[in-house]
Regions:
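Short, hinge-like loop/turn segments at secondary-structure boundaries
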Residues: 4-6, 92-94, 123-126, 239-242, ...
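Alpha-helix capping and helix-loop boundary segments enriched in small/acidic/polar residues
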Residues: 54, 85, 89, 114, ...
Length: 358
């Protein structure tokens, strides 16, 4: 079962098993869990509290059954992953459920990254009239304190209200924060000492470097520029400028010898053939080999820089620019990359990404 335990003063008082198991999107709970069938209520300091877990709240039957059995307030425990506009959907749902059943709801959500999922927090408390009376900030661990009491005249549960709500995040701001949290927790949970970013002088690697610094701190980010004979002077200048503005370790490692060595090795087998993308891909694979060698030697995670648009059409080199352990921009379209880069630049008096890169 997907369950919650009720514990008071060190004593286990009971369990609630989730009733509605989602099987859509990133969820596949019916494969792993059995379905719960019973409503669970418990009394605490004169309040009768009903429990729900995540999807239970998105279906009407569980909360209706709790209300009919005498619940005066609902606590809903959630591991609801981030997606754009999801917080507005949650708020609309909570207001609808609270007003329809005339019952306050405490909505607690997980925060942090887990592999390729990000949980954005934003826990809330809604009164029986559907008003949000307490709200936690997004993407941060936070504790809300709410006082619930019986009103002698109406018999309803009255909730205390916070004085100031957290600032709402724009869509681009919440997306950026999700990328930062996702990378931070993946690296920390995996035990890596830091991350390696292969810079090209382009916008994808520039944005990835910013996210890495914001997630881990400049002292744990290592930028490597690996030029070849076709690399422009502008690309070299822009990569160096960004690394210096973000105060990260910056190394230039030319790949000419590695590429020519591989071409020389392949020359007998490539005789009587015409040069094509095969030779071009050797450059990307030489860069991937260098980054992975640095990763093995120093214990840093290689983060790749391909965006969702490139992944969708296969615009990448297998064992080349795809070589790495985590792709920060894998769910970000190229158009969003530009928007995110401009957003990050607006956070600083001096843009950290050179304007001509954008």
């Amino acid at each position: 079962f997907n369950s919650v335990a009720i514990i008071h003063n060190g004593q286990q008082k009971g369990f609630y098993h989730k009733q509605c198991l989602p099987n859509y999107g990133v969820f596949d709970e019916r494969r792993y869990f059995n379905t719960g069938h019973n409503q669970v209520l418990f009394d605490y300091q004169g309040l009768t509290i009903g429990l729900l877990i995540c999807e239970d709240l998105w279906q009407d039957a569980p909360i209706r059954a709790l209300k009919e059995k005498g619940a005066e307030i609902i606590i809903s425990l959630n591991a609801s992953p981030f997606e754009q506009n999801k917080q507005e959907q949650r708020k609309a749902l909570l207001k609808s459920r609270a007003t329809e059943h005339n019952i306050p709801i405490v909505y607690a959500n997980s925060v942090g990254g887990q592999d390729d999922l990000v949980f954005d927090g934003g826990s809330m408390v809604v009164n029986a009239q559907g008003k949000i009376v307490q709200e936690a900030p997004r993407f941060l661990q936070h504790t809300l304190y709410v006082v619930a009491r019986h009103d002698a005249q109406s018999g309803q549960v009255i909730l205390s209200e916070q004085r100031k709500s957290p600032l709402a995040l724009s869509q681009i701001a919440e997306t950026y924060q999700a990328l930062v949290v996702g990378l931070r927790d993946y690296v920390n949970h995996s035990g890596f000492k830091g991350v390696l970013v292969g810079l090209s002088g382009g916008i994808d690697s520039a944005l990835t470097l910013c996210i890495a610094v914001d997630a881990l701190g400049a002292d744990k980010v290592y930028a490597v520029m690996m030029p070849y004979e076709y690399t422009s002077q502008i690309s070299l200048q822009d990569a160096q400028a960004q690394a210096h503005r973000l105060n990260v370790s910056y190394t230039v490692c030319p790949i000419h010898a590695a590429v020519e060595g591989m071409r020389h090795t392949l020359e007998p087998m490539f005789s009587n053939t015409t040069a094509d993308t095969t030779e071009e891909n050797i450059q990307a694979r030489a860069r991937g080999m260098i980054l992975m060698a640095l990763s093995n030697k120093f214990g840093h995670l290689v983060i790749t820089t391909g965006n969702k648009s490139e992944m969708a059409v296969g615009y990448a080199t297998l064992y080349g620019d795809m070589a790495g352990g985590f792709d920060v921009l894998k769910d970000v379209y190229k158009t969003q990359v530009y928007a995110l880069a401009n957003y990050r630049n607006r956070l600083e008096e001096t843009p950290v990404i050179p304007e001509r890169v954008i």
